[in-house]
Amino acid sequence: MKYHDLRDFISLLEQRGELKRIKQEIDPDLEMTEIADRTLRAGGPALLFENPKGYSMPVLCNLFGTPDRVALGMGQEDVKALRDVGKLLAFLKEPEPPRGFRDFFDKMPQWKQVLNMPTKRLRNAPCQQQIWQGDDVDLTRIPVMKCWPGDAAPLVTWGLTVTRGPSKERQNLGIYRQQVIGKNKLIMRWLSHRGGALDFQEWCQQHPGERFPVSVALGADPATILGAVTPVPDTLSEYAFAGLLRGTKTEVVKCVSNDLEVPASAEIVLEGYIEPGEVAPEGPYGDHTGYYNEVDDFPVFTVTHITQRRDAIYHSTYTGRPPDEPAVLGVALNEVFVPILQKQFPEIVDFYLPPEGCSYRLAVVTIKKQYAGHAKRVMMGVWSFLRQFMYTKFVIVCDDDVNARDWNDVIWAITTRMDPARDTVLVENTPIDYLDFASPVSGLGSKMGMDATNKWPGETQREWGTPIRKDPAVVARIDAIWDELGILSDTPAR
């Protein structure tokens, strides 16, 4: 399933009844968030606000408001098919040579997909149909949403920030929120470990005092947007991965004012620079934790050019206590993570990041346990294998007879198979999400691993309990006569 641009995807969603056009005048200040939040919690459609109060530019919200829409954006029909995306990423992360002639042909589809990885550079692009520069640059023309009553200012949320380190061949795409503080200025809130911040740090070391080029694309095609939030290998660019998802090369164009390349079909592109040493206090903002975060200084992004499509659409979202759009993305991307982890740890049966745990702060892993201490190895592996789990505070490891996605099962395993002193692992002074105000130091805190597996010799000296199992023959006999018994008329035979 191929979408050339965001508008193709909008058209498909509308055909499927997955997009609602809102013709009434709605204020980007708080009102859009209220409508989007109610719609998302009800599993409703994407929303296109055609008449934002005080603006002529429509606003697109809740684009990825259900896991199935995330899957559609990745070119798949349902969430389960995202396991195939994960298998492709696992293959790209650690490709293996064919083990024989048959294996060569089995892997041929994966190798053919690699042909779509290089970008296609255009000279003329839709995203540059209109160009604003100098005094004409005015961010207040864009209907940037203010999401929560205590937010400091309107906030750009879905911008794909494009950077390149001075010694890197490939660009980095990252999504960092940006507070509007003037007609041509935003605050770039990127954390120190993120790709954009690392590129900036390297730039400042090699080009002290020089301006760092930055571009931000808004309203790219869904494959490019989702490529920026997917755990692609460090050696693979987000544009290359988007080409794999789309099945066609990602079309890019050189920016008007710098050498960065942006998605050619993007609705809006902000071009400019960060002046080393220029910072401003960012926040507070309501975020995905359900709280307002503290104020801190971040670099100022000065916009020198705005390029856009004719009749541009502004793509936006809000973040708050789950469920929100990032939590929905987390549910879908969970399926991508599983094959990647299984490639490194074949003993993993399932891996689950509950959305109520902010989609990354708590993980439940089920394994085919093979030896004493196995659960602890898996805990350490989860924390260290992918940088996406650097901020996962709690890892619960269970046996494969437990459903990782059923809290009844998980709580049963914790309360019957764990001794708190023996089976709890605490690791101090580890990287923690900057937004986690529960940590004693900003960005540094502890992690907890919980071994809720059955204990093997060497882990306990006691006789271990045997789970109760029903007799299958008895269950089958009662199933056959259950309806005749008429005990619970609405309850079918199991």
From Swiss-Prot:
It is a peripheral membrane protein. Mn(2+) binds at residues 172, 238. It catalyses: a 4-hydroxy-3-(all-trans-polyprenyl)benzoate + H(+) = a 2-(all-trans-polyprenyl)phenol + CO2. Keywords: Cell membrane, Decarboxylase, Flavoprotein, FMN, Lyase, Manganese, Membrane, Metal-binding, Ubiquinone biosynthesis. GO terms for biological process: ubiquinone biosynthetic process. Coiled coil: none annotated. Its main location: membrane. Signal peptide: none annotated. InterPro entries: UbiD (IPR002830), UbiD-like_C (IPR049381), UbiD-like_N (IPR049383), UbiD_bacteria (IPR023677), UbiD_Rift_dom (IPR048304). Pathway: Cofactor biosynthesis; ubiquinone biosynthesis. Prenylated FMN binds at residues 175-177, 189-191, 194-195. It is found in: Cell membrane. Pfam families: UbiD (PF01977), UbiD_C (PF20696), UbiD_N (PF20695). Binds 1 prenylated FMN per subunit. The active site is at residue 287. Its cofactor is prenylated FMN; Mn(2+). Homohexamer. Belongs to the UbiD family. NCBIfam families: PRK10922.1 (NF008175), UbiD family decarboxylase (TIGR00148). This is 3-octaprenyl-4-hydroxybenzoate carboxy-lyase.
